[in-house]
């Protein structure tokens, strides 16, 4: 499938993210995510001590990348996992048989089998709730530092963000292009 110009994309601005997990909590509440699982979280990565006594670390969003060539879609035996016309990788819960193939195939390890329903679950940009009502995803709406941007790839504000040189996408050879863009920043803490 070709990378759609009108598809939905998200940008996680690591320069603005403070790792507060407000996005994780909002998602869990709205989507009734069971204890011990998540559709989105922010991880702290690359802690290292620099020679000047500063600690360097990075806040990284971990969620579905909405891959162009999603391995989770290609392994699904029932067609429950699919990429919709907006570029969102979805799970049709009525067709999911809980085989776990999509969970195992995800190169980013962001799917899980919901123990309450027995079907696969993951971030879908709140497509069936907030997005359907014309609102941005829950994570975007609660971010206190405006570190998350969401919109269609052909919108001017989104184009401005994704065109910056610091913006990158986490790639995996078998997934193709992904719809989660990131602006990298390494935070510092300590004495200079």
Swiss-Prot record:
Binds 4 [4Fe-4S] clusters per subunit. GO terms for molecular function: 4 iron, 4 sulfur cluster binding; metal ion binding. One of its GO terms (cellular component) is plasma membrane. InterPro entries: 4Fe4S_Fe-S-bd, 4Fe4S_Fe_S_CS, ET_IronSulfur_Cluster-Binding. [4Fe-4S] cluster 4 binds at residues 76, 96, 99, 102. Its cofactor is [4Fe-4S] cluster. The keyword Transport applies. [4Fe-4S] cluster 2 binds at residues 27, 123, 126, 139. [4Fe-4S] cluster 1 binds at residues 17, 20, 23, 143. The keyword rRNA processing does not apply. Residues 8-36, 55-86, 87-116 form the 4Fe-4S ferredoxin-type domain. Keywords: 4Fe-4S, Cell inner membrane, Cell membrane, Electron transport, Iron, Iron-sulfur, Membrane, Metal-binding, Repeat, Transport. Coiled coil: none annotated. It is found in: Cell inner membrane. It is a peripheral membrane protein. [4Fe-4S] cluster 3 binds at residues 64, 67, 72, 106. Its main location: membrane. Component of the PhsABC thiosulfate reductase that catalyzes the reduction of thiosulfate to sulfite and hydrogen sulfide, with menaquinol as the sole electron donor. Proton motive force (PMF) is required to drive transmembrane electron transfer within the reductase. The PhsB subunit transfers electrons between PhsC and PhsA. Composed of three subunits: PhsA, PhsB and PhsC. This is Thiosulfate reductase electron transfer subunit PhsB. It comes from Salmonella typhimurium (strain LT2 / SGSC1412 / ATCC 700720). The gene is phsB.
